[in-house]
């Protein structure tokens, strides 16, 4: 995300060692396929996929490192999102360009920006697979908002924004609602907001929970949202929580107790029975899954220096 243009850079700098800005995407109903995520290769980020059993780790993208002046933490290929049919992965290219690619690494498509000097980032598919929602920052107007466009950039339209900008859009499985992250006054902590896909009134869905992390996701049946808490304080543990779209029924799924224990939500599985997330212990990370009630937790990729981020569980290609 081009946080240098918006207040979102403040949070990214404050907790750069704590979280990584990651968009959130709806998981659409289907059979469980491969899990996509970004990881740092030492020369920028790339998109990877892996089977739910931890086998078949595959590097999808091989993009060139960003030019000077772009945050290394967001350069390369970041923020993957699966298309509903499993044939495409949308992602952010070097922070401020929308792109998509087939999961076998072929067919790269880059959407030309229509925001001179600005940023278009964090794409997520709509349930019909024909459109992308994304964050757009226009320095000419200082407008940071959620937009929607066709897969090739056609038919662009502004959807809405929150009290402190808008980031990490996600469309509900029924295609009617877009949720996104925004800063809230007076403490500039992040919360999730919602707006209709055609625009209209914006409402706050979640409490701030000391700052919601950038990644959140809809359950495939639209009944709940998953996210993590405590983005605003690196001296606190991070836990995965779920909530109903009307803001009721907050439920904690993990029970980390110390600041070196951090669970960062990824997404629901397409069959709606699992949640994938990153568990951190100190400087080690593991790709984990658990049932939607927090039970059955186990590792897909064990604890190591390899750090999966912006995790999105895709469907078996139709």
Question: What role is predicted for each listed range?
Answer:
Residues 21-318:
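Sequence signature of WD/YWTD-type beta-propeller architectures
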Residues 2-26:
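Secretory targeting and sorting signals
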């Amino acid at each position: 995300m081009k946080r240098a243009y918006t207040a979102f850079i403040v949070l990214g700098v404050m907790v750069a060692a704590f979280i990584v800005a990651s968009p959130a995407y709806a998981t659409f109903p289907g059979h469980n396929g491969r899990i996509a995520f970004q990881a740092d290769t030492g020369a920028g980020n790339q998109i990877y996929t892996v089977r739910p059993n931890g086998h078949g780790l595959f590097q999808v993208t091989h993009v060139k490192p960003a030019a000077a002046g772009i945050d290394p933490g967001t350069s390369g290929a970041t923020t993957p999102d699966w298309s509903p049919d499993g044939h495409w992965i949308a992602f952010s290219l070097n922070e401020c360009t929308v792109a998509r690619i087939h999961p076998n690494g072929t067919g790269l498509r880059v959407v030309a920006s229509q925001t001179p000097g600005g940023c278009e980032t964090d794409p997520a598919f709509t349930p019909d697979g024909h459109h992308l929602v994304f964050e757009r920052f226009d320095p000419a107007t200082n407008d940071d908002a959620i937009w929607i466009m066709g897969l090739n950039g056609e038919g662009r339209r502004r959807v809405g924004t929150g009290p402190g900008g808008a980031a990490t859009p996600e469309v509900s499985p029924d295609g009617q609602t877009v949720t996104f992250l925004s800063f809230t006054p007076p403490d500039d902590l992040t919360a999730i907001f919602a707006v209709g896909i055609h625009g209209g009134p914006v409402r706050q869905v979640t409490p701030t929970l000391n700052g919601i992390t950038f990644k959140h996701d809809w359950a495939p049946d639209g009944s709940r949202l998953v996210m993590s808490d405590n983005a605003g304080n690196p001296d606190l543990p991070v836990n995965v929580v779920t909530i109903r779209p009307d803001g009721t029924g907050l439920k904690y799924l993990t029970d980390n107790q110390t600041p070196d224990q951090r669970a960062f939500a990824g997404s629901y599985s397409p069959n709606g029975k699992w949640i994938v997330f990153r568990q951190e212990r100190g400087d080690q990370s593991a790709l984990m899954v658990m049932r939607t009630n927090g039970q059955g937790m186990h590792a897909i990729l064990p604890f190591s220096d390899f750090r999966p981020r912006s995790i999105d569980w895709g469907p078996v290609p139709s």
